């Protein structure tokens, strides 16, 4: 193992590792079709997966070459290099906006209607609703909201450029990261949806974690806590990401015996901000608890899976499930109607009419039945755990099917984590990967539907962590020297 690691430290060893990685993922990606790159792929006469694969490989090769140069001397940037990356991000965003126009998601329109009417409910996070409502007053036709989203994307590009410059990476690496963000995220960053803001905040937080490896300074802390605060304000499940990341940062601070109170205070502040946004703010505004049954879709689908596949289920328990969740004939019909729409077969699809949907869909039928559904799950699922876990396994398809970009991004990240493990680096080198683990848990266990947007952070983090892993792998001594004696 030491001999193999020594070879990987060399320039050609790293190139060989990148080529081997490319060959493996080429075999996975050749039959794939990637939605955002399909048009470009058709022009080239190849599949979308091949185009995406070569983009990722080019970023990997550029990072490896940049690393080799950075290990000998710091790469000079032109004056205002970060501004060049900001201009690049803004140019890409405006071009896409000009070509596609202002595109709004159903979530955005629903929140905007709440903000304009003043009749708040908890279907969408109130912090997001109040934000877009305030921006809506500044400009017509959602122009202010689009401008704010573009500003956050440009900010993410700017902090990425600042980090690349501090690491001594060439300007080309930062430009490559910014250029890959839009296509890897299926252009969703230019759509008015809270997941676009969420993804930009995730990139900013990841930059902060990457910067922490070299130095714990104001830039690292500002990007880390700022990005994390944006996450918890936009989605309640981001509290899991904040908790996992905060625990990792606090553990590293304790091992280094430096800045523990400041880290604890910062993480506590972020978590309190999330709790205030999703618990205290609805109470203060008197928002109706109209959260539809989608938040119960996963436990309810587990119960449906037990009814369909577990022949040993006692008749009285089967009757209880069907009485609370859905009549058995309807349940079985929907289970077999659209198996490819994981997580949506009981929500929107397969119903005969609007009246049938309103009567039986989880969205309407389970609204306000949280206690009953969760109590039934706690009582019955432990005895049928093997069958009940099938929906969770099905939800991982988004992360393991190479025809989807998140699976490709996850493969890149696993490869990079393996390289860092070979280098036997300290724990703080793996901090940027912690939020991704929490995001995988969210996609698998918390997300109620099979939607690409839930995995956008995985895709957005991939090109950034390409450069990070390369810089850390090839030039770890600089970071170790600055933090010598602090764990």
List the model feature ranges, each with a label.
Residues 98-111, 119-131, 135, 139-143, ...:
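Extracytoplasmic catalytic/substrate-binding loops of multi-pass membrane glycan-assembly enzymes
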Residues 190-198:
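Short acidic/glycine- and proline-prone juxtamembrane loop motifs at membrane-interface regions
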Residues 221-235, 246-247, 267-277:
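Membrane-interface alpha helices of multi-pass inner-membrane proteins
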């Amino acid at each position: 193992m030491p001999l193999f690691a020594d070879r990987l430290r060399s320039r050609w060893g790293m190139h060989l590792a990148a080529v081997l990685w490319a060959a493996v993922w080429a075999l996975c990606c050749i039959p794939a079709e990637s939605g955002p790159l399909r048009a470009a792929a058709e022009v080239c006469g190849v599949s979308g997966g091949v185009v995406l694969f070569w983009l990722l490989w080019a970023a990997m090769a550029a990072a490896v070459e940049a690393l080799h140069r950075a290990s000998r001397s710091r790469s000079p940037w032109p004056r205002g290099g970060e501004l060049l990356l900001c201009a690049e991000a803004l140019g890409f965003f405006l071009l896409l906006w000009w070509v596609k126009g202002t595109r709004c998601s159903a979530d955005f329109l629903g929140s905007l209607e709440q903000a304009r009417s003043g009749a708040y409910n908890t279907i969408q996070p109130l912090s997001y609703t109040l934000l877009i409502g305030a921006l809506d007053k500044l400009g017509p036709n959602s122009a202010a909201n689009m401008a704010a989203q573009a500003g956050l994307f440009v900010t993410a590009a700017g902090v990425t450029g600042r980090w690349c410059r501090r690491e001594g990476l060439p300007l080309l690496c930062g430009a490559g990261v910014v250029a890959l963000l839009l296509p890897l995220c299926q252009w969703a960053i230019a759509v008015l949806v809270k997941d676009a803001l969420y993804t930009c905040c995730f990139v900013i937080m990841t930059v902060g974690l990457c910067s922490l490896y070299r130095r714990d300074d104001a830039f690292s802390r500002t990007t880390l806590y700022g990005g994390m605060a944006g996450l918890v304000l936009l989605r309640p499940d981001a509290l899991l990401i904040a908790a996992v990341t905060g625990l990792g940062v606090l553990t590293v601070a304790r091992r280094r015996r430096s800045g523990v109170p400041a880290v604890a205070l910062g993480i506590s502040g972020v978590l309190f901000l999330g709790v205030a946004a999703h618990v205290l703010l609805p109470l203060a505004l008197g928002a109706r608890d109209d959260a539809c049954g989608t938040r119960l879709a996963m436990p309810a689908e587990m119960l449906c899976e037990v009814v369909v596949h577990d022949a040993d289920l006692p008749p009285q328990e089967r009757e209880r499930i069907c009485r609370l969740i859905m009549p058995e004939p309807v349940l079985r019909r929907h289970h077999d109607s659209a198996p490819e729409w994981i997580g949506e077969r009981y929500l929107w699809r397969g119903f005969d009419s609007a009246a049938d949907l309103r009567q039986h869909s989880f969205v309407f039928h389970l609204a306000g039945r949280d206690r009953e559904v969760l109590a039934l799950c706690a009582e019955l699922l432990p005895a049928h755990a093997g069958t009940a876990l099938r929906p969770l396994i099905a939800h991982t398809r988004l992360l393991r099917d190479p025809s989807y970009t998140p699976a490709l991004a996850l493969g890149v990240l696993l490869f990079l984590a393996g390289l860092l493990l070979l280098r036997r680096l300290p724990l703080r080198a793996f901090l940027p990967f912690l939020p991704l683990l929490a995001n995988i848990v969210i996609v698998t266990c918390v997300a109620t539907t099979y939607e690409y947007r839930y995995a956008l952070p995985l895709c957005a983090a991939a090109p950034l962590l390409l450069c990070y892993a390369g810089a850390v792998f090839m030039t770890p001594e600089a970071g170790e020297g600055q933090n010598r004696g602090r764990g």
